[in-house]
């Protein structure tokens, strides 16, 4: 199975840089009019962009053994040996630029000059619309020469231009292209040079993205004019300002920072057509429900990590959430424009915006945000919608879908109601107009302790997963919303008898999804019956530090990037590759527990 090294910035994502070949298999970007993600792809046999170096007419990066590192834990860089040539390729999506750069450096180790060709070739085979499912676009792909960049323009039309991408280089480059009958376009960009003995040559290829020809070409030209060194320095400075170092643990440092930047650039992004910041599950089509919005995923998982690293970005996220997404708070999933994708009420998602807002204020002490009209209206909407789901006999609130998005067994879920308690209790402390919610929160806690606490055959109390207020309950847990987190939300102490009994039950070998006797002994559930990375994050947040350190040493996940679940023996990804919001929650939990 191929492994990938994703990278990206706010505007463009490179989800599939192939670790074996160095080829860029696709480029993705967010598009508001399409309600999701556009994916520009190569063919099965030829990537969209393949770096190559020819010595005496033979050789390429794809046939050499590539060794990989990441500058500042985010910018992929490969090194390889091709005969007497030492090759280095660096992939840089500069901060605040609508595009990316590929720097190719060749060092001649021989004692004589060498004629070398440094270039890129590839195939634009198809374009796709991605929101959960991937659907091919039916417009027309074109390629032509343009004076705007003195090179090629790749442009897509559906009655009018939808998007374009265009290359430029900082050295003299020859270009050619062929349009095939099947609609695919192949191309070649090449720089011919003679490298002296012990000499070095370098070429930077810039790729600009835009709505049409001029925007794409000038996006590339802007990076060219700024120069590669300036763009690289700016980007590395930005990354270094947000990196975290775990003293004496290089592996944990890399894991944290790579996942942090993956979260920042794959769970948020700026749309090409409207230039709005939006939040999504993942900007990688490799994730099985990509490019859509979930209140829970964005606000309970990715938001805490981004708030840790960049409070200003976190505030922008809240503006989007309480603006575009406000009217459908609590609905299963939505498109990036705020309209409903998958219907179904989820209680944890309804209060997720409150929890994120409270977290932001506690971190920054910026209470001015509470006077923002969108925030005021959003809080009012949540409180009104919450009342619609209140039980007739007590202060418990129902849900239709569980935190996995699967249908409930019983309507009153303990974890979800703890979130309601937490959100109202904290909101009551933020402003006088919400002080009355303190009493409501107390009544919710009383209802949880009265109705959600059950007893086993030996009379030991524990928290049931869900109840129906008619005496029925189930013993269960879900990593996306775990009972393990009750102390994290200050609902109870980690030493509380009821809590300890609950955790013992769901972690016992008798519990089907505990994986207690496996090397990766974290909790799963029927949605993905393997240990979840979210469960590992939950364990970090509830104090199982040494247990988690041991697992972090063993797991590979998705080539070092967080995924939904891993094999309980090998630690390799089993479901949910490129899970950007999960990457954020893993980072936040690592920072809370291990920094």
For each feature predicted by the language model, list its residue ranges:
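The feature captures the catalytic groove of carbohydrate-active enzymes
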Residues: 202, 206-219, 287-288, 333-334, ...
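Well-ordered alpha-helical scaffold segments within catalytic/enzyme domains
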Residues: 242-246, 262, 298-311, 352-369, ...
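Aromatic-rich carbohydrate-recognition surfaces in CAZymes
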Residues: 288-392, 417, 577-595
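C-terminal catalytic domain of Rieske-type non-heme iron oxygenases
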Residues: 335-338, 519-523, 550-583
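Acidic/polar, glycine-enriched structural segments that form the non-catalytic walls/loops
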Residues: 86, 92-99, 103-291
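Extended ligand-binding clefts on enzyme/binding-domain cores
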Residues: 291-295, 381, 391-392, 410-419, ...
């Amino acid at each position: 199975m191929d492994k990938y090294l994703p990278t990206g910035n706010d505007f463009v994502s490179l989800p599939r840089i192939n670790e074996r070949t160095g080829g860029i298999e696709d480029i993705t970007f967010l598009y508001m009019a399409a309600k999701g993600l556009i994916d520009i792809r190569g063919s099965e046999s030829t990537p969209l962009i393949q770096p190559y170096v020819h010595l005496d007419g033979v050789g390429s990066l794809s046939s050499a053994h590539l060794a990989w590192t990441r500058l500042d834990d985010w910018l992929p860089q490969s090194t390889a040996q091709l005969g007497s040539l030492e090759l280095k390729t660096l992939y840089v999506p500069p901060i605040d630029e609508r595009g990316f750069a590929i720097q190719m450096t060749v060092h001649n180790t021989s004692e004589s000059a060498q004629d070398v060709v440094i270039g890129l070739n590839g195939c634009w085979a198809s374009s796709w619309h991605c929101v959960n499912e991937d659907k091919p676009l039916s417009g027309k792909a074109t390629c032509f020469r343009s004076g705007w960049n003195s090179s090629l323009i790749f442009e897509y039309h559906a009655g009018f231009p939808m998007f374009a991408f265009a290359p430029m280089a900082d050295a003299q480059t020859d270009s050619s292209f062929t349009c095939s009958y099947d609609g695919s376009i192949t191309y070649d960009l090449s720089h011919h040079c003679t490298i002296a003995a012990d000499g070095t040559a370098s070429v930077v290829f810039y790729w600009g993205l835009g709505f049409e020809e001029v925007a794409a070409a000038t996006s590339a030209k802007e990076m060219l004019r700024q120069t590669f060194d300036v763009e690289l320095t700016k980007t590395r400075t930005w990354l270094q300002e947000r990196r975290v170092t775990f003293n004496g643990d290089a592996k944990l440092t890399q894991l944290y920072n790579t996942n942090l930047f993956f979260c920042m650039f794959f769970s948020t992004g700026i749309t090409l057509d409207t230039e709005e910041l939006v939040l999504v599950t993942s900007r990688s089509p490799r994730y099985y429900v990509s490019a859509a919005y979930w209140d829970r995923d964005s606000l309970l998982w990715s938001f805490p990590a981004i708030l840790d690293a960049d409070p200003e970005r976190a505030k922008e996220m809240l503006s989007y959430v309480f603006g575009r997404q406000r009217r459908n708070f609590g609905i299963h999933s939505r498109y990036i424009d705020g309209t409903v994708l998958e219907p179904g009420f989820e209680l944890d998602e309804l209060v997720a915006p409150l929890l994120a807002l409270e977290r932001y204020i506690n971190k920054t002490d910026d209470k001015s945000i509470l006077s923002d009209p969108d925030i005021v209206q959003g809080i009012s909407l949540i409180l009104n919608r919450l009342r619609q789901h209140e039980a007739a006999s007590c202060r418990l609130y129902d849900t239709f879908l569980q935190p996995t998005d699967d249908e409930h067994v019983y309507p009153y879920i303990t974890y979800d109601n703890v979130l309601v308690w937490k959100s109202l209790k904290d909101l009551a402390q933020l402003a006088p107009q919400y002080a009355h919610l303190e009493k409501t929160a107390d009544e919710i806690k009383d209802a949880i302790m009265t109705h959600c606490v059950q007893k086993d055959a030996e009379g030991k109390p524990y928290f049931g997963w869900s109840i129906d207020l008619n005496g029925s309950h189930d013993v269960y847990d879900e990593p996306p919303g775990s009972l393990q987190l009750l102390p994290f939300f200050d609902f109870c102490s980690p030493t509380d008898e009821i809590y300890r009994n609950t955790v013992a039950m769901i972690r016992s070998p008798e519990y089907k999804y505990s994986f207690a006797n496996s090397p990766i002994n974290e909790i799963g559930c029927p949605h993905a019956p393997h240990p979840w990375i979210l469960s590992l994050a939950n364990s970090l947040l509830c104090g199982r530090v040494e247990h988690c350190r041991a697992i972090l040493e063993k797991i590979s996940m998705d080539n070092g990037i967080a995924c939904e679940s891993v094999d309980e023996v090998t630690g390799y990804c089993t479901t949910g590759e490129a899970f950007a919001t999960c990457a954020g929650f893993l980072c936040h939990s690592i920072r809370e527990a291990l920094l």
